[in-house]
């Protein structure tokens, strides 16, 4: 009798999983958007929470059977707020892109203008133009303007940005939102230097902390929400060592707009098992985050210097990497 093709495929999947695990056990991945969660986080991820649905907000669910899910989600929000010194946290977004979309949906309309870093300047595709298939433009219909950028210093030009915003206002293209953060940046963005200016034009400021969330949590980078950002979005699995997922932070005034944007706007049920994993990761970051973030930066600088010494051109040399 010929072997079942279904059985062959089934076995192949587990063979490939074993090969993958063996490969990565003997590798040092250098992909900035990846990290390894702790055994405790992984235990939460494989819990029965992954089989359940929980639309809505703790205490106000569409589904029954959410007693313990609600307890964990409330704890998760408490930990997120404590970790980032925020008054409000929505832990339901299933990715950093969905977190960004929640802010777009809450604080702008299709056709509004957002100013953001361009992709060559380190911006993320979720901040991008429609013609580049960027999430902000393609999905939410935002018109995107880019910050003037000093490539040599790897920084947004503050004076030129102020001038550009004034010119955009004259041309009836005043931004509704300003996005800081990105997917390739080594140094803090000038939130503090620009926030007062932007707020004189009633521009909502969001900081996409996806790649630096763990460094911010550990107090080793900038502190965007103390520097003037209204909201902060992130994924939870890069320098923050959690599961794949997203997070939106803000103050009390942002609670209702963000909650409505997340549900029912962008998600029905969220990934509840990953939410539990986020809670564990937030607790771990509160306990170990400062030392972890310091070691991440130390490792990166030493590695950059070593690469530079053997002839690689490494970004950020003039600023100490």
Regions found by a protein language model. Give the residues of each.
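Conserved glycine-rich beta-strand-loop-beta hairpin in the small C-terminal domain of fold type I
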Residues: 300-301, 317-321
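N-terminal glycine-rich, Lys/His-bearing helix-loop that initiates the first secondary-structure elements
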Residues: 1-78, 196
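Conserved PLP-enzyme active-site core in the AAT-like
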Residues: 71, 75-311
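Short, well-structured beta-strand/strand-turn elements
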Residues: 313-315
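Short, conserved alpha-helical segments within structured domains
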Residues: 37, 68, 95-96, 274, ...
